[in-house]
Amino acid sequence: SVAVVENGRSFCGVLDCPAKGEVFAASIGGGSRMNGITLSVGEPSDELKVAGPKHFVVPFANMQSKQVEAVGHVPSLAYRIALIAAGRISASFVKPNAHDWDLAAADLILAEAGGTLVRADGSRPLYAGKTVSHGVLAAGHPSLMQGMLGVVAATSIG
């Protein structure tokens, strides 16, 4: 993945997943697309598909009135976040030490599809600064963030 970043924010980004034949792209105010098709996270359904470390997913599932399915390991963090933008995954917890190069394009792709990626304090991450790694993050539909951040706050690694 690659992104153009200015003042800590991504302005355009592309994620290529050649194994799946999928190319995700986004620009500020221009929406997100996969292979030319507009993406939207959509409202969370009755069954949430949540990815990330088990010590976050299990407590999150326990506090939901909806059924939660734990998503198996997706080896590319950027692709996992893009899957949220495409509506294939509802949300993902991101363990500490993710890097700008894993996040900058995917963050914009998710945001332009109506989702959000936030730090444990609820703020959006900044990119291309003095520090290029991040703490725990939560990604998904904005309506899921309060519950996700509650789990992060209650977990010692958060």
Language-model region placement:
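DPxDG-like acidic metal-binding loop motif
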Residues: 1-33
